[in-house]
Amino acid sequence: MSGADPASHAVRIRGIYTTALTRLFLDAGWMVVDASEPIRRRFDTEFDATAPTISAETTADRQGVGVQGTPTAVDEAAALLSVGIDTLSWEDAAPVGSVIDGKITDTRRRGALVDLGTETGYLPFRNTDDHVDVGEMVRVQVRESAAPWTDDRPLLDTDIRVSTGLATLLPESGTPTVSTRDAAAARELVGMTELLGVEAPDGWRIQWEHAATEASMDVLKSALNRAVVQADTLAGVLDDAPPAADRTEPTGLFAERAGRWFWFGRESRFVLDGLRRSVTTTLPGHHRIKTGADAASAGVDLAEALCGSDWSGETSDEDGIDTFPFSVVADCFGPSVGDQVDIGHGKPDGRLISLGSGTVTDRDDDSVTLQRELSGGGSYDALDIPRKNGDIAVTTFREGRWWYPTVYRRDDDVLGTYVNICTPVECFPDSVRYVDLHVDVIKHGDGRVERVDDDELEAAVDAENVHEALAEKARSVASALETAL
């Protein structure tokens, strides 16, 4: 933590967590900028039209949020956004705006894969004027970042630009433009640009963002000044750097921003529900339901609009298990018996691995049972039994529980039971999702109970992928299961 005044930071927030996070940041003394109309209606406060020091946007899968901005602001936001015991976060290895000399490792039909040193990015052929081949070095900039748990890759471009939130400098000549649908506001802003007394450097053109149409002259001047300084700094770095073609390995050249990704687990979503409930009508499990599906999200909005202030918003237990209507949600949106449901196995390092899909064989008020027929090859982890074609795995996931059992069977024989300790399980319509906490408890076919992989949990703590409170919870759950089994 830098100890900077929170009021010196401004955040732009978008996505399903916006109301909750607006409450969170305002309570911490931050400025919230470029607020949407629903947010302006819900909060009795003035929202400044100034350049954000960070943006916080919900990921496309609604699993969490990505934060991009100045390193100091990102660090301070990280402390705020760790809202629950099952919030996990990871540094963005390739923040938006980073300039890197990368190596082409593969070409696809419409683009190329580029080794950035820290991860692999994707360069669409439309984003480069030059033909690229495997093995070549290319200078690229990160346009869009990607959460570590998704299959997406950072989106790259060979055009290098700079941006300060309100003002972007493009590497081309021309008059200023405004990225807005409000033609009158755009004309006014273009006219005001000449009065700022700040000119774009040679070879750069000004493009204002829509939020700039509501900003004061002082704010516009400050944003443009910072963009000019950033462009001059970047130009100096690139002038001093050898051509990308002269390098043999990926090399980072420029990064004004930092980034961080936040995975919200089930308990964290209920904390966010509470923040949102302090502002407006919020059903139990609001964020949990919205994460599941588009149709479910629309259903929540409708229910809250119909209930309005008549909804008390009271919850009867700490984590919301008693008040979250899982069976009602599952009846409406799934999963149902016969459905195929994927097992989304999150890892503490940020990856999300599919363990395959299973058929729903049973579903009650709080749990889903999946059955998978397995193929032969290898052995069952920790059971030391060869895997054969036709073996059956039966897994029961209870919504909100910190563990789940998988029973492995061959014909009528039980080979063993593998109990995975994880963050509270969420049973969505198409997938079950959680983060594996490494330590597991095994019950062998002969009745012997064994606890495994404590060392992997310790390694995750040492790597700062799992915080100590979460690790201690995992150990406690494992100890209780050892006794119970």
Report residues per predicted region:
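Phosphate/ribose-recognition catalytic cores of enzymes acting on nucleotide-derived substrates
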Residues: 381-424
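Terminal disorder- and signal-encoded targeting elements
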Residues: 1-8
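A hydrophobic, small-residue-rich beta->alpha segment in the mid-to-C-terminal subdomain
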Residues: 436-482
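Short, internal acidic amphipathic alpha-helical interface segments
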Residues: 179-194, 406-442
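Short cationic amphipathic helices and targeting signals
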Residues: 9-13, 61-69, 177-178, 206-208
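Long, continuous compositionally biased terminal/linker segments
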Residues: 2, 39-86
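Extended, Lys/Arg-rich, non-catalytic nucleic-acid recognition/anchoring regions
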Residues: 2, 16-19
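Single-stranded RNA-binding surfaces
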Residues: 70-72, 86-350, 359
